[in-house]
Amino acid sequence: MKRIIQLLSCVLLLSALSGCESTQQILKSIEQNYPATAGGQLTTADIAAGLKQALEVGAQNSSNQLSALDGFFKNAAIKILLPEEAQKVEKTLRDLGMGSLVDKAVLSLNRAAEDATKSAAPIFVDAIKSMTIQDALGILKGGDFAATNYLKTKTTSALTSAFKPVIQQSLDKVSATRYWSDVFNTYNKFATNKINPDLSGFVTDKAITGIFYQVSLEEQKIRKDPVSRVTDLLKKVFGSKEAQGS
């Protein structure tokens, strides 16, 4: 049962981290290179070797998807916009014919997030490798977002530490942070509702929120319809008595 729980939980996390097509390719490779022994059991060595390959590829795929050009900018669900409290200022600028300036600012925020996301893969892999049997059971039997919540708990601090300096550097390239600070520190002198002048902190939070949003969508898919996304090996494992809790 221990080996089955390890396989199920890690594959669930892998599927949450990578796209459908990539996940199927990875799992097929595991089946081909690490076949089940007689009786349908996988050895500890098989599982360790297969998961090492799967986790490395899956985590990299996840990072690649979001760090690609327009990975954030052209995804309406996670595109980073100006803070809500700054939207009145944005409207004023657009009314004054400075819409292109605002558009460039928004683009710079998303480019910074895309740059930072390149560092996500090794952080996710470290978290998955540290997963205990208790963690695995909780994920397997948990709610729709158990894997996502596990990753949030284990990686948010590390992601923040890794992302913020990259985002800061990316924004500094276009002087975005300086302009932001100058404009909104001045604005805050007269405004009742202050605007946070820490632009890199704002973008970091939004980038991390976007990553976990994507992970949660993938987790829901595999939980609601696992048969449609796994190989024969996973169908067999999900249908086992141990996996069903009997």
Regions found by a protein language model. Give the residues of each.
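Alpha-helical transmembrane segments and their juxtamembrane interface "caps"
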Residues: 66, 98, 119, 149, ...
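N-terminal Sec/ER secretory leader and immediately downstream segment
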Residues: 26-108
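A cross-kingdom marker for long, charged
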Residues: 28-33, 207-246
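An amphipathic alpha-helical core segment
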Residues: 166-208
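C-terminal motif of bacterial Sec signal peptides marking the signal peptidase cleavage site
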Residues: 15-19
